[in-house]
UniProtKB/Swiss-Prot annotation:
Fe(2+) binds at residues 181, 262. Keywords: Cytoplasm, Heme biosynthesis, Iron, Lyase, Metal-binding, Porphyrin biosynthesis. NCBIfam families: hemH (TIGR00109), PRK12435.1 (NF009095). Fe-coproporphyrin III binds at residues 13, 30, 46-47, 54, 125. It is an enzyme of class 4 (lyase). GO terms for molecular function: ferrochelatase activity; metal ion binding. This is Coproporphyrin III ferrochelatase. Its EC number is 4.99.1.9. Involved in coproporphyrin-dependent heme b biosynthesis. Catalyzes the insertion of ferrous iron into coproporphyrin III to form Fe-coproporphyrin III. The keyword Lyase applies. It is found in: Cytoplasm. One of its GO terms (cellular component) is cytoplasm.
Length: 310
């Protein structure tokens, strides 16, 4: 039996793989404007603080390969081939779509490695993929828009919260902070579902883990003058401590799916500076990365998308 071929377009933000790639990467994020030496030095220092470069590039590769393998195990009649498309560094999203076309792929399914939909992220990734496909005449792409409430995703974080709580003696004095990457506040005016989806994710995990001490915050906001979604996780940490006297903070950056700069620096360094200053305990559960239970989650999301009537 001839297997049907489907392209698996896995999209993500991207990260520099070497120190030399930091400047072009940052320039692309800034829409072609080169960063000042001061900004470049600041970003480079952050990377150096987590070991030189982010482990994200390898993790994203591992996630795409593992997802391809899992889907090929699940389907007897379909052969999946994964293509990585990145937002700010090669291989760009457009490169991946072109490669699928070159490989003779006529049908594809796409997923962004970010659970919550926003006009800034998922809509823009999917838009770029569809635009390129239209421009070059294929392949036809079915796109996943969000998976923030996928039961296997929620269960991953429920297990992480439970495992972390098991290490804490005074559980009544522990608080979980659920967070995602902040975006400009103006998205709320456009009716963007991003903030509400993060809240729903937090509520579902809290319910599953049976916790009532939790809050939602935002992190890693951009370096621009416009207002960004808040409260920032560092400010939130101080407020929660002052209001409730918590002695343990558990940071769950559920808007992210891997160890990278925003987690390894913004959480593990910047938030820990705050908890150390307050004299309280810092906990940050393991990120999904390419763990089998997370790959199962992504595969389930893809299965559901393919089962939809077009």
């Amino acid at each position: 039996m001839t297997k049907k071929k489907i392209g698996l377009l896995v999209m993500a933000y991207g990260t520099p793989r070497t120190k030399e790639e930091i400047e072009p990467y940052y320039t692309h994020i800034r829409h072609g404007r080169k960063p000042s030496q001061e900004l470049l030095d600041d970003l480079t220092e952050r990377y150096e603080a987590i070991g030189g470069v982010s482990p994200l590039a390898k993790i994203t590769d591992d996630q795409a390969i593992a997802l391809e393998q899992k889907l090929n195990e699940l389907y007897d009649d379909i052969e999946f081939k994964s293509y990585l498309g990145l937002k700010h560094i090669d291989p760009f999203i457009e490169d991946a779509v072109e490669q699928m076309k070159e490989d003779g792929v006529q049908e594809a399914v796409s997923i962004v490695l970010a659970p919550h939909f926003s006009t800034f992220s998922v809509k823009s990734y999917n838009g770029r993929a569809h635009e390129e496909s239209k421009k070059i005449g294929g392949p036809r792409i079915q796109s996943v828009e969000s998976w923030y409430d996928e039961p296997l995703f929620i269960q991953y974080w429920v297990d992480q919260v439970n495992d972390t709580m098991a290490k804490i003696e005074d559980k009544d004095k522990a608080c979980v902070i659920f967070s995602a990457h902040s975006l400009p506040e103006k998205i709320v005016d456009y009716g963007d579902p991003y903030p509400q989806q993060l809240k729903e994710t937090a509520d579902l995990i809290a319910k599953g883990a049976g916790i009532t001490n939790y809050a939602v915050g935002w992190q890693s906001e951009g370096n621009t003058p416009e207002p960004w979604l808040g409260p920032d996780v560092q400010d939130l940490t101080r407020d929660l401590y002052e209001t409730h006297g918590y002695t343990s903070m558990i940071y769950c950056p559920v808007g992210f799916v891997a160890d990278h700069l925003e987690v390894l620096y913004d959480n593990d360094y910047e938030c820990k500076v705050v908890t150390d200053e307050l004299g309280i305990d810092y906990y940050r559960p393991e990120m999904p990365n390419a763990k089998p239970e997370f790959i199962d989650c992504l595969a389930t999301v893809i299965q559901k998308k393919l089962a939809e009537k077009e």
